[in-house]
């Protein structure tokens, strides 16, 4: 084999460039919400798994929370079932909840675990029901009627997070596992709930006081009025952009999860373009990142 010194030098430069970021995040907890195109494109699936293994290998503690809405939709369609949505939230009756649990806690979760392990990691799959990891309650939702009056909407077994059993996750991390969590929760009566994966990721980051929360999406990040990605926002600026309509629609719940996490002590949260190969590494190991960072300290984008 002939050694190409130019290629070797480039590799060495890349590795040394990453060194300050590795030092910054070593022994830190990173919560990554995995969803969108990154879960349906084989090349992106592979790059995500390798990214997670690399983070663990260099001394960080990644925790993965995954979605799986499209996979649930596909199985419901195969079974001839229809599932309504209200403001993006799936109406989940008991039989639909059984299917959701089977897909998220079964095939999707184990597929991610297997892929991470294939690339040299040691992942372990969980749902919020395991060891009462995610204590949930029924999500109460209101919708404004034609008369302008708020009316309650029953979404069925759709939940909100009450608490996260951080001891379980910390025990797994201490044993060198990579936790992979399906967004299901359980209430005190043993009822199972389907919970938004962004919300679960945000609450896991909050209860564990993670260094960073990363939400992988199918968009570039928060767009300004000029259509360009806003690379950094403070919580106060986010409030202003929601108020003036710059941040609107489906982005609001996602940005609210990130905002709540930062206001609860998570150092930074970032909306990441999961369609970019190795987006997780690019966000952690470069100043520019691949999305919109939300933090009280925007110098994190320039150090």
From Swiss-Prot:
Question: What biological-process terms (Gene Ontology) are attached?
Answer: arginine biosynthetic process via ornithine; L-arginine biosynthetic process
Q: Which GO terms describe its cellular component?
A: cytoplasm
Q: Where in the cell is it found?
A: Cytoplasm
Q: Which GO terms describe its molecular function?
A: acetylglutamate kinase activity; ATP binding
SUPFAM superfamilies linked to this entry:
Carbamate kinase-like
Chief site of localization:
cytoplasm
Top EC class of this enzyme: transferase
Q: Name the Enzyme Commission number(s) assigned to this protein.
A: 2.7.2.8
What positions are marked as the site Transition state stabilizer?
A: 33, 254
Keywords per UniProt: Amino-acid biosynthesis, Arginine biosynthesis, ATP-binding, Cytoplasm, Kinase, Nucleotide-binding, Transferase
Q: From the UniProt record, give the pathway where this protein acts.
A: Amino-acid biosynthesis; L-arginine biosynthesis; N(2)-acetyl-L-ornithine from L-glutamate: step 2/4
Residue sites binding substrate per the record: 68-69, 90, 194
Any coiled-coil regions, as ranges: none
- InterPro entries per UniProt: AceGlu_kinase-like_sf (IPR036393), AcgluKinase_fam (IPR004662), ArgB (IPR037528), Asp/Glu/Uridylate_kinase (IPR001048), Glu/AcGlu_kinase (IPR001057), NAGK-C (IPR041727)
Please tell me whether the keyword Protease is annotated for this protein.
no
Catalytic function, reaction form = N-acetyl-L-glutamate + ATP = N-acetyl-L-glutamyl 5-phosphate + ADP
Q: Name one Pfam family in it.
A: AA_kinase
Query: What NCBIfam families does its record include?
Result: argB (TIGR00761)
* Record function comment: Catalyzes the ATP-dependent phosphorylation of N-acetyl-L-glutamate.
Entry similarity comment: Belongs to the acetylglutamate kinase family. ArgB subfamily.
Recorded hits in PANTHER family, A to Z, give: N-ACETYLGLUTAMATE SYNTHASE (PTHR23342), N-ACETYLGLUTAMATE SYNTHASE, MITOCHONDRIAL (PTHR23342:SF0)
Protein name per its UniProtKB record: Acetylglutamate kinase
Give the encoding gene's name: argB
